[in-house]
């Protein structure tokens, strides 16, 4: 029986949500007997589009495509099961699975535009109530969805994220030891906390550098004064980098730093672990669930906690090596193939 996948994510820049959707679809393509991937015409993820042999339908774009073109196409196909993987879907089409990755907009509404909040607060309850089944990416997110939207726990399944096979250790000699962070100015990512803690670590004798990956041209960076950090010779803002370079930076860092207040899953620390890099994570949201005892935890509200974490992981080689080994074990728990099989089983139970 035909299954249709909403592949509008092919028209979007890649974040964790789009990565999940693409990787799951590449696996589902080989697991389902009859599956179509459909998308609007404004595709930017050309390689994935070709690999999935996706089909362009309709004349609209964005949410309007989901509201008008996609349901019309599904009706012409006999109303098959529709799989939505990226936080959205047609509101009034009932025979669907919807994936909601987190409800950060409920927990930190002050960090989102009012137009975004208005739309999501109208859309998400209708998506949840109008779907046959709901998927999310951690037990923590499942609990959050059920709490905020009063959805039955039996209706929600957890399908974990994983890491691309391209992520693996790539050791190289480096000019100086460094900690690594991937920057975002969203409040819940707690980026300024990293800078403040690192400067304090420096004052207490820390010798390492801090490398920060991210686009400083992003409008969100203009909201704060970064001057006292950009002129620090030990803090290097690297801008956006390719996956190949990201793997090199992960593989040769003293540790990866991820003190986020709130995540649905947390892919970057898992990428770091896959590359043999120990991770420092906030003891918050889903991170203890996903990483167990394989990372060093810090209190995301206490700067001194991260300072101590910098000191411990930089000074204790035995401890650092133990985190690397635990990281490898932890990454073995997650694979796109395993996650896609879980989703396939859900799909097959509904068709």
Placement of each model-derived feature along the sequence:
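Carbohydrate transferase catalytic cores enriched for Leloir-type hexosyltransferases
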Residues: 1-351
